[in-house]
Amino acid sequence: SGDGSGKPKGIIKETPADGQAIESAAPGYADLIAAEAALPLAYENDAVWCMSKKTFMQYYGLVDETGQPLGRVNYGLAGKPERFLLGRPVVVCDYLPSFTSAISTGEVFAFLFNFKDYILNTNYAMGLKKYEDNATDDIVTKAIMIVDGKVVDKNSLVVIKKSA
């Protein structure tokens, strides 16, 4: 979620392509359908949903007109939850706000994206410094690395924002 000034530019700070920003007053089935429709066919293969766990649970609790749940949680071979919405994997993270009435109008709370379209640029040189802090007797390890990053193809990005 960085703004690109002194830190990598975050995915949700990128301006999506025309027609790829969906506005929603509350999580609903129509949001998911509109976002899926806005994702160009050429970018569909590796795109995943990204949202907070609380937002996922709001979508997960929705049912279609026949009473079938929209979300699916399966337990893979390792016993870890595997989350899906409309057949597409969901990555849950704490870096996006959960949908509540408290989030600001225009704030992104979920998005579809192919993470291969984000590039982290680095010189692969990490400086390590280890020293003892004499005031606290703690051993401190400090690592410094020069990195930058940004979305290189925003056509796979579809955001869902809170509407007024």
Predicted regions and their residues:
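Extracytoplasmic/periplasmic cell wall- or extracellular glycan-interacting regions that localize
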Residues: G10, S24, A47-C50, Y59, ...
